[in-house]
Amino acid sequence: MMGTAHHNQTAGSALGVGVGDANDAVPGAGGGGYSDPDGGPISGVQRPPQVCWERFIQKKTIKVLLVDSDDSTRQVVSALLRHCMYEVIPAENGQQAWTYLEDMQNSIDLVLTEVVMPGVSGISLLSRIMNHNICKNIPVIMMSSNDAMGTVFKCLSKGAVDFLVKPIRKNELKNLWQHVWRRCHSSSGSGSESGIQTQKCAKSKSGDESNNNNGSNDDDDDDGVIMGLNARDGSDNGSGTQAQSSWTKRAVEIDSPQAMSPDQLADPPDSTCAQVIHLKSDICSNRWLPCTSNKNSKKQKETNDDFKGKDLEIGSPRNLNTAYQSSPNERSIKPTDRRNEYPLQNNSKEAAMENLEESSVRAADLIGSMAKNMDAQQAARAANAPNCSSKVPEGKDKNRDNIMPSLELSLKRSRSTGDGANAIQEEQRNVLRRSDLSAFTRYHTPVASNQGGTGFMGSCSLHDNSSEAMKTDSAYNMKSNSDAAPIKQGSNGSSNNNDMGSTTKNVVTKPSTNKERVMSPSAVKANGHTSAFHPAQHWTSPANTTGKEKTDEVANNAAKRAQPGEVQSNLVQHPRPILHYVHFDVSRENGGSGAPQCGSSNVFDPPVEGHAANYGVNGSNSGSNNGSNGQNGSTTAVNAERPNMEIANGTINKSGPGGGNGSGSGSGNDMYLKRFTQREHRVAAVIKFRQKRKERNFGKKVRYQSRKRLAEQRPRVRGQFVRQAVQDQQQQGGGREAAADR
């Protein structure tokens, strides 16, 4: 057995520091200088070429059996090995090499053999060595000029420790001693093949715990810390049995105030364990040994004793408190014990996140602080708001407030109540507001106008509407950022104010006295002609004449029953960033015969899809979307002329009983015509270009064919074109000669 000093010297070399890396470890290798016992080279001092192999292994020399059928290759490799301070025994073939191996007096430490040889090949020699009881501990290295994957896999699968590709480099031969070092340490039981620094562990506290630890196989290396040191198949743990010894490893925190006694870190006798230095003590975790912290050490010690006790035995019953734990790496933790002990979880990263310091936990509580700030703002605005009653029942609001969380990560918009210009804020949701610097603010109107949120909206009611407003599950509205009275959208109760948004699809009113709930369509692209509140809705039928007739009746009857001066709309803004404005022709129609008590307005065919700008109430905004019916104020938008026309700077004004005025400017039409003209010019240019290209190609094809035809018709002499006159002369001369011959 070697001492600790030898371990310290061999550890670095075994982990990648080769013999010939700097010509330090092996004196005389490549003409280098001599190395002192501490490992530092002494320059300028020339010594005879010798090696102190006892620093690394318990042998004075390393004998290498070189097997190669080619004489020149064998001589060159032998010279290189001798230059690296190895003792070489050459062999011409596999049979001669096997003879040397059977002679125990040779004490061969390493076999370097060629794969392809006459007679007994290298693979056959490898099989013989692996099947021999004594020779199987000798590391065998195969070498060949054929680096095919099948050959390499075949050699390594049969027991070879390495495969070298010819031509062999000198640095590869300098590092061959590492295989001997690993094999010596794995067989002696004083270390492991991986070269990690090892030491003897303490004796076990009890036989039960040692047996449990002996049967375990810790592989918790989530954070890059090697928890176990697994020996190879041929390792010996010192007790005569060959098995894995990964059960001896423990992860101990450096910052833990509670010292872990040798009894708690118990291991069976005659075993080795690796010393692992943990750089992050709060992240490292062990499957069997719980981690500790700074507080309540006594209480934690009792918990550790219960956790490490006989309940860990396989097959033994557990108490009720820990009955749910299906594996030893799971552990129940109370909320009050989070500061006292670290939870044992499969995912060590999640455990590390839960075990942060209190300062970081407080800093992470951003949502709670936002909720507190919004509560304070709500209280301040409620105190400054004038007294105005809402027609929404308080019970419904309370119930809804209890159901919904204090901080909604949704696009819901707060509601406001009021009549006319005095609209106040009834309640505010603790919703996430976006900053004015957001990229979406560029698509909104100036601050002077009321900004409509983006999203789907429900409908609202008239002044004397006491019915329950419809609830839209798919209605998500964003909260307005303007300081003016916000526009109420997607409300769950009924109120008096007018809800305005931006849309091109629906201009509807809330039923005045009907108690039944009507579901608002959540789809924007509705291709139907029916009313939004008609019981028989067919939003996907492109031609529904029956629905159209019923819609006319419903709209006309709603116009009679509606309060004067009220203009209701259900507006939806398309979420595209580029705004294509749509201009509506608003007409005023007067009523028909009696119909169900629901006020509604309708958009007739063709179905229009567009993007409207923001709308406002009693202000100059974009959107001329509301026409008045003279007396009743119910609107009907009919026959949108073009699917992509523009609304610009429209106004929605409320007058007295006479109704409202719907007006809009045509500045958007000029822009549309300009764009349309540019598009037409572009299309015409493309068509013209394609036509010219077609004609040009056709002309080329015609010219090519005509020239080809002419070339075929022209006479040739020995491949060269000749004139027609020359050919005629030749023909005439040939005729004369034929006549003379006759």
Swiss-Prot record:
Keywords: Biological rhythms, Flowering, Nucleus, Phytochrome signaling pathway, Transcription, Transcription regulation, Two-component regulatory system
Biased composition (Polar residues): 236-248, 318-330, 503-512
Residue ranges with Basic and acidic residues bias: 299-313, 331-341
One GO cellular component term: nucleus
Biased composition (Gly residues): 656-667
Every CCT domain range: 682-724
One BP annotation, GO: negative regulation of long-day photoperiodism, flowering
Induction pattern: Expressed with a circadian rhythm showing a broad peak in the middle day under long day (LD) conditions.
Database matches in InterPro entries: ARR-like, CCT_domain, CheY-like_superfamily, Sig_transdc_resp-reg_receiver
Protein's UniProt keywords contain Transcription regulation: yes
Region ranges (Disordered): 186-249, 290-346, 377-402, 478-517, 533-568, 590-671, 697-742
Stretches assigned to the Response regulatory domain: 63-181
Main location: nucleus
Similarity comment text for this entry: Belongs to the ARR-like family.
Protein name per Swiss-Prot or TrEMBL: Two-component response regulator-like PRR37
Upper lineage: Eukaryota, Viridiplantae, Streptophyta, Embryophyta, Tracheophyta
